[in-house]
Amino acid sequence: GDDGTLTIGENSNVQDNAVLHCDVGGAVMLGKSVTVGHSALVHGCTVGDGSLIGMHATLLNHCVVGKNCIIGAGALVPEGMVIPDGSVAVGVPAKVIKQVSAAQIEANLHNAAHYVEHGKLHAAELAKG
């Protein structure tokens, strides 16, 4: 976010070692209830509400990940690629392989809510000194 705008939606979480970055004048936009997994790189792109970005995934400039998507661990979403709402995309380069099930959408939202609660517990412990 040092060279552009960084927006993280309500109930979203960015896990350990993940990097959110953009070029000068660019932007990173995470919707609501997004989970960005450990060591993912999210660079100058948009991620829709309820999506899960897997560990070590890479999202490049101007790509768009729709709502309620799953980007598999280690996937590479190339510059400018659009992943439609409700898609599962994996691989290098990423390819949509199927649609997300209702159970997977619910699990993603539950996962995001869990990390919000986890964060509140850590904040309370830190406040105790």
How would you describe each model-predicted region?
Residues 1-22:
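A positional/architectural concept
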Residues 2, 22, 27-30, 37-129:
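Glycine-rich hexapeptide-repeat left-handed beta-helix
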Residues 15, 31-33:
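A general structural signal for well-ordered alpha-helical packing
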